[in-house]
UniProtKB/Swiss-Prot annotation:
Protein's organism: Penicillium expansum
UniProt keyword terms in alphabetical order: ATP-binding, Ligase, Nucleotide-binding
Record-given protein name: Acyl-CoA ligase cnsG
Alphabetical list of PANTHER family matching this protein: ACYL COA SYNTHETASE (EUROFUNG) (PTHR43201:SF6), ACYL-COA SYNTHETASE (PTHR43201)
Pathway the protein takes part in: Alkaloid biosynthesis
EC number: 6.2.1.-
Gene this chain is encoded by: cnsG
Residues binding CoA: 376-378, 446-448
Length: 481
């Protein structure tokens, strides 16, 4: 039963404080690597099946020491930046861990970065504009992986499949370091995401946990349906990186045989995880939110003037506490835009996400503030329209954007991907489907289908799998001109 609504006078400010336990770990990645090597020794830690490489905990520690010695012999000194430009390969981890040992910030590079952008420890993916370089400390990532892995309740017997790119904080910290922290084995199916490779691992290995962003799960589910049978040992699925529609969660639980679904939230600037849904059986009541804040993390919802709103009211989600980045590398202006100090001297990081904190202290993300569509003065959230669209039996994936309109400012546009071998619904049928639950003003006026002329064969995505909505807006604007 839903909790009763409090009168406005009885509602509390929308601010939550994470637990003060467990104790913050004051160690470095290098020391942690040696400690875990002593504990787990010959237990398998990581595997790259496509490279036929498997490393134990002791082998990871030994190899990273040898690489560290080689880097020092090459003339590198404490504080020098070491660039890593590769996909999900074992060499990535060797260099990353070696850099951590000798105090050299690892600069995680992507192939599409310009030289001027290659400047810091972890690069923010960014669905628009140039990625910014978020500077994270050992304290940040060690403790974030510690708290997140505890919330996921990993066991040493777990075998984890992660198709997430190591060049992003979700894949590097929330997947690899969390697995490492708990003594698990983690598999990286291939260098770059391949749904076929993921399904091969799920069906041929005793995988108990899978990570992914929504677009990855859509692709993997499609391949699983084509092969006709579920993974044989799946227990948990962990998603993040973008809002996860409840219809997708339901499909993951049903088609993958998942018992527990965990919905994480964060951003590179917060190390990255700040929220995670409670560990419970797949159910609508527990999975409509991103859960509660992690330990040593605080969150609040503010209005456009920076004032804390009341519980149940929408506003921008802000984060403070242990997970905050030091700032953007050599960019005080960008740092000051996103990180502000309140009257009490507390630094808050503005996420750019619209959210609600309920009376049970659970948080719900309602969309990116910059993605909100303003149609004739009405604010429309793309997320709720996307959730409705993918409930249609013939629509596999959807992305909703605002498109310019001379009279109303913006109209609702959507880009849709149909299931293979399914009949495409008419545009009017799509609008009627949305109007049925959400009202006439949220029905898309401009409808585009992936695969049609001028659209492309797939959604434009970042390296981490997020839809690039700015590119979709450009495509839609051009086609409507």
């Amino acid at each position: 039963m839903e909790s009763p609504q409090l009168p406005p006078s009885m509602k509390r400010p929308a601010i939550v404080y994470g637990d003060k336990t467990p104790t913050i770990l004051e160690t470095t990645l290098g020391h942690l690597l040696d400690e875990l090597s002593d504990i787990h020794r010959d237990k398998a830690a990581v595997e790259f099946p496509w490279q036929s490489i498997r490393r134990t905990y002791s082998e990871l520690a030994k190899t990273s020491k040898l690489v560290a010695i080689s880097l020092l012999s090459a003339g590198l000194c404490h504080g020098d930046r070491i660039g890593i430009l590769t996909g999900n390969r074992y060499e990535f981890l060797d260099v990353f861990l070696a850099a951590a040992r000798i105090g050299c910030p690892a600069v995680i590079l992507q192939s599409n970065m310009s030289p001027g952008e290659m400047k810091a420890a972890v690069l923010k993916s960014g669905t628009t504009g140039n990625p910014k370089a978020a500077v994270l400390t050992h304290r940040n990532v060690v403790n974030n992986s510690h708290f997140f892995s505890r919330a996921c309740d990993f066991e040493q017997s777990d075998i984890i499949c992660s198709p997430l790119p190591l060049c992003h904080s979700f894949g590097l910290v929330s997947a690899f370091l969390c697995s490492f922290m708990r003594g698990c084995l983690i598999l990286f199916p291939t260098e770059k995401f391949s749904a076929d490779a993921v399904v091969d691992v799920l069906q041929n290995r005793d995988v108990t946990v899978i990570y992914g962003v929504p677009t990855m799960f859509f692709a993997v589910l499609e391949k699983l349906q084509g092969r006709g049978h579920k993974p044989r040992s799946m227990v948990k699925a962990i998603a993040g990186g973008a809002p996860v529609p409840y219809a997708l969660i339901t499909q993951i639980c049903q088609d993958m045989g998942v018992q527990y679904f965990l919905n994480g939230y964060g951003m590179t600037e917060t190390s990255p995880a700040t929220f995670i849904s409670p560990l419970g059986l797949c159910s609508e009541s527990s999975l409509r939110t991103i859960g509660k804040v992690l330990p040593h993390t605080n969150a609040r919802i503010v209005d456009r003037w920076g004032r804390t709103v009341q519980q149940g009211e929408k506003g921008e989600l802000c984060i403070s506490g242990l997970p905050l980045q030091k700032g953007y590398w050599e960019d005080e202006e960008k740092t000051s835009e996103i990180m502000t100090r309140d009257a009490d001297g507390v630094i808050w990081l503005h996420t750019g996400d619209e959210a609600i904190i309920g009376e049970d202290d659970h948080c719900t993300i309602t969309g990116r503030i910059k993605d909100i569509i303003i149609r004739g003065g009405l604010n429309i959230s793309p997320v709720e329209i996307e959730e409705r669209l993918i409930l249609h039996p013939f629509i596999q994936e959807a992305s909703v954007v605002g498109l310019p309109d001379k009279t109303r400012g913006e109209i609702v546009g959507c880009f849709l991907k149909q299931y293979v071998d399914m009949q495409r619904p008419s545009d009017e049928a799509v609008r009627a489907w949305v109007r049925e639950l959400l009202g006439w003003h949220k029905a898309p006026e401009a409808i585009f289908w992936i695969g049609d002329a001028g659209i492309g064969e797939d959604f434009p995505k970042t390296a981490s799998g997020k839809h690039q909505k700015e590119k979709l807006k450009d495509i839609g604007t051009y086609l409507l001109a």
